[in-house]
Design a protein with these regions (language model features):
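Active-site histidine-anchored catalytic micro-motif
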Residues: 1-139
Length: 139
């Protein structure tokens, strides 16, 4: 069985962003040489997320609005976490809702997606470097 590991690094210029990372993950898969197996992609930071969905700008705006309703950034004082001097309590909650990782089947050397599925990096407390782990195992 083959095992492949790669780190992808992101630094978005805004507090929140959704980045389609499917091309980078596909490049990792090609480099791994795995034809049949599993591909794990996970955010290695507690205020970032990895998830699968459609790459449609209206949907991304809907996510922004919905997440801000669930866990608004302001007032910063509303979060006990922020009493430590942080201002990102909302980002931790948004990450929890959107998830830490995805696992995608690898079939015949390709990510086995359903219609419209893409892999996204979700950033909820940006403007600094963060990493995503890609781990691929199989034959």
């Amino acid at each position: 069985m083959k095992s492949y590991r790669q780190e992808l690094w992101f630094e978005v210029p805004t507090r929140r962003a959704f980045v389609n990372i499917t091309p980078q993950v596909e490049a990792c898969l090609r480099e791994s040489g795995v034809r049949e197996g599993l591909c794990l992609v996970n955010a290695m930071h507690i205020t970032a997320s990895v998830f699968v969905n459609d790459d449609e700008s209206g949907l991304h705006q809907d996510y922004e609005k919905w997440l801000e309703k669930l866990a608004p950034h302001e007032p910063v004082s509303a979060y006990r976490h922020n009493r430590t001097g942080e201002d990102n309590g909302d980002a931790h909650l948004k990450r929890q809702v959107m998830g830490r990782e995805v696992v995608v089947a690898v079939t015949d050397g390709r990510l086995d997606f359903g219609p419209w599925e893409q892999i996204f990096y979700g950033e909820f407390d940006g403007r600094r470097r963060k990493r995503v782990l890609v781990k691929i195992v199989g034959e």
